[in-house]
């Protein structure tokens, strides 16, 4: 520990800390623009100047390491004058855009100019202006406002792993640019908006829409992937205006994927706002009572074993649990969250989780990707891997896939024989596996979405056992899930094998990705919020609330249950999922024993211990899996997906459609 004096107070800080961190620990507020705790130090704004005894001039506290016996002053006339001077220089070329700037009200420059500036301006020359740069459909630029803090540049290279932003020229002519002015090739580019301390980088979809003080903030969870990123929904009235990240050090830190951040406009389009019944081949509007009575009458006329419920990728745990309870009361055990027929082993909870945990990536020294594409499936998780690789503390190899993961990676090939050789120890990469103390294996849908997924999974389990990576001090086996609902569904047993061709009635809970050609003679009930494939095929449509319009539990890929709170009201006469299921149970004269959300959650906590520990990860068991299925000769792949459109909300988002167009245009230019 290092001892130093800050404004007369003796403090101790860890070795390697900066003076800025020491001052912050001492409770002192140090103004800054370029410094960010998650980025490399630049030291170029000079706003964090403090006085150090025996130093002839103020020092940049963010870049100065602490040493024993330092005496620091943060509020002397010298410091005050230095900060006023720096602020005056920063404002020389900064435009008076505050009334029309989207950063107004949440701008670091505004706040610090008010607190640390002189209050008067001595500059009477012409201000410089800079042409705005094009960075794609998500980021709106106003580069005349840029103060050259270089946060965006460092984020792009250090966190996102893309070397596409930099500075050109020198002195007062310096400009931050994307060089070729193309769409940024990153799935987490929107975070540059958050870290920009001024209004140089703003959200293009949110431009001129609202001011901070007009918005209601609601804590929620991102549902467009399985990471469980913590988000804040900002709404005005019953409209979602924007989505921002919430800090959670164990999951997303303070970052957010572009799909979770920008796809909210999809909540406005193609919404199901009233019930429909198919009559004479056409869907016609109906009342709730008529729709529910039709559903109840049809259910009563079908044998229980011919009824199935399938949950979609955005379904909450509570909705699946109530629907499962209803089907069990009817005498049916046909229900599944596995609409894509993934080959997942569910003998133990640790067999289908990301056991290392997202934060645990910091400890790994070797990562083996098998049929996994974390860049598109879990962008924020992938950025953690990338940061470790760029710090030379993690090596990554992969089997299957030739896509760019934004970091250095060793390609082992795509032949299934590679996994067999690793399992028996004859492959040359075996040496690296043996040398690794904390080996992490990530299995993606390039494995479990295959017909021979169980056979490959069995081989991977042999590797897990051979190298003992599921032990008390380290959990190295990981399944990379790609949907928000799947872990929660598996946790409650909403996962029985089903054969669609043998069914007479299908209850689809927001399901749009099943092969509907197998359900041509099946009566389909669709409970969901968007008019997509499920609604188009339905005989009865029950309009439900989206994730922003109801409270629900989602379990992320590492097995952590979290609550997404209700931010706005459902559209039209749509109802919350559990309310629809409860009313349907009433028409069926069935008592499911749960009348409200609180009762559902109490029952969940009693029956499944994971739901008694919201926001926490419980200890999970793991057991070796073996299969006698035959391996195919097809190579393992992890093909790039249409990242921006993976569910009904993102598919109906105008912003996401623009992203797809921009990416296609960029790819054509590069080609």
UniProtKB/Swiss-Prot annotation:
Residues annotated to bind [4Fe-4S] cluster 1: 94, 98, 101, 107
Residues binding [2Fe-2S] cluster: 34, 45, 48, 62
UniProt-recorded Gene Ontology molecular function terms: 2 iron, 2 sulfur cluster binding; 4 iron, 4 sulfur cluster binding; metal ion binding; NADH dehydrogenase (ubiquinone) activity; quinone binding
Keyword Plastid tagged: no
EC number: 7.1.1.-
Coiled coil region boundaries: none
Annotated positions binding [4Fe-4S] cluster 2: 146, 149, 152, 196
Cofactor annotation comment: Binds 1 [2Fe-2S] cluster per subunit. Binds 2 [4Fe-4S] clusters per subunit.
Residue span(s) of domain 4Fe-4S His(Cys)3-ligated-type: 78-117
Chemical reaction(s) catalysed: a quinone + NADH + 5 H(+)(in) = a quinol + NAD(+) + 4 H(+)(out)
Domain of life: Bacteria
Sequence ranges assigned to domain 4Fe-4S Mo/W bis-MGD-type in this UniProt record: 215-271
Keyword Endoplasmic reticulum: no
Pfam family, one: NADH_dhqG_C
Cofactor requirement: [2Fe-2S] cluster; [4Fe-4S] cluster
Family: Belongs to the complex I 75 kDa subunit family.
Protein name from the UniProt record: NADH-quinone oxidoreductase subunit G
Species annotation: Rickettsia conorii (strain ATCC VR-613 / Malish 7)
Origin organism lineage: Bacteria, Pseudomonadati, Pseudomonadota, Alphaproteobacteria, Rickettsiales
